[in-house]
Amino acid sequence: MGTRDDEYDYLFKVVLIGDSGVGKSNLLSRFTRNEFNLESKSTIGVEFATRSIQVDGKTIKAQIWDTAGQERYRAITSAYYRGAVGALLVYDIAKHLTYENVERWLKELRDHADSNIVIMLVGNKSDLRHLRAVPTDEARAFAEKNNLSFIETSALDSTNVEEAFKNILTEIYRIVSQKQIADRAAHDESPGNNVVDISVPPTTDGQKPNKLQCCQNL
């Protein structure tokens, strides 16, 4: 059945954020269990699921966290974001208000999460083409302006769901790998330590990627 769940080289925590009803839970279940529930109700509290993928011969275990987007769950934000190295910021392409709220979610993410977290903007429910309210080009331009990656998905018909999660996990892995190489070069040693200090390029203007500057000496 492939790699056992307890065997992995890296463990990355990725959080799903965005308004309630945009399809976060179904993105999670589609990627981790290949399931979709048309009757799914708003998530109560927090839940997470895991799935492992292979990147460059390494086993990457993703621990993906999902919480409801309603305001009353704001109290859990600190614990929810703690330790996250990636985030999927999800909106519904058929509901413009969920896209308008992306900016607020992005601010909350940057207030609570590590400043170097990798963020992907996800326009979900791309199967609802006839109801589209958010132009793809508009969302892509917003993502570029805010240094986010961007993709449109459909949890219902599986379009780009694998790609969304695998792309963000691969991006995190590349950054971690470069950080390890840079650290070893800087210290001129390779201390067999499995604890990875993750430093990713900044997602906000005006910040410098301090931890990666040692690469310039290579």
Curated annotation (Swiss-Prot):
Descriptive protein name: Ras-related protein Rab-11B
Membrane-spanning residues: none
Membrane topology: Lipid-anchor
Binding site for Mg(2+): 25, 43, 66
Regulation: Regulated by guanine nucleotide exchange factors (GEFs) which promote the exchange of bound GDP for free GTP. Regulated by GTPase activating proteins (GAPs) which increase the GTP hydrolysis activity. Inhibited by GDP dissociation inhibitors (GDIs) which prevent Rab-GDP dissociation.
Residues carrying Citrulline: 4
Stated family: Belongs to the small GTPase superfamily. Rab family.
Motif window: Switch 1: 36-47
Modification Cysteine methyl ester, positions: 215
Catalysed reactions, semicolon-separated: GTP + H2O = GDP + phosphate + H(+)
Annotated binding of GTP, by residue: 20-21, 23-26, 37-38, 40, 42-43, 69, 124-125, 127, 155-156
Subcellular location: Recycling endosome membrane; Cytoplasmic vesicle, Secretory vesicle, Synaptic vesicle membrane; Cytoplasmic vesicle, Phagosome membrane; Cytoplasmic vesicle
Segment forming the signal sequence: none
Pro-peptide region(s): 216-218
Gene3D superfamilies found in the cross-reference section: P-loop containing nucleotide triphosphate hydrolases
Keyword entries, A-Z: Acetylation, Citrullination, Cytoplasmic vesicle, Disease variant, Endosome, Glycoprotein, GTP-binding, Hydrolase, Intellectual disability, Lipoprotein, Membrane, Methylation, Nucleotide-binding, Prenylation, Protein transport, Synapse, Transport
Organism placement in taxonomy: Eukaryota, Metazoa, Chordata, Craniata, Vertebrata
Disease per record: Neurodevelopmental disorder with ataxic gait, absent speech, and decreased cortical white matter: An autosomal dominant neurodevelopmental disorder apparent in infancy and characterized by severe intellectual disability with absent speech, epilepsy, and hypotonia. Additionally, visual problems, musculoskeletal abnormalities, and microcephaly can be present. Brain imaging shows decreased cortical white matter, often with decreased cerebellar white matter, thin corpus callosum, and thin brainstem.
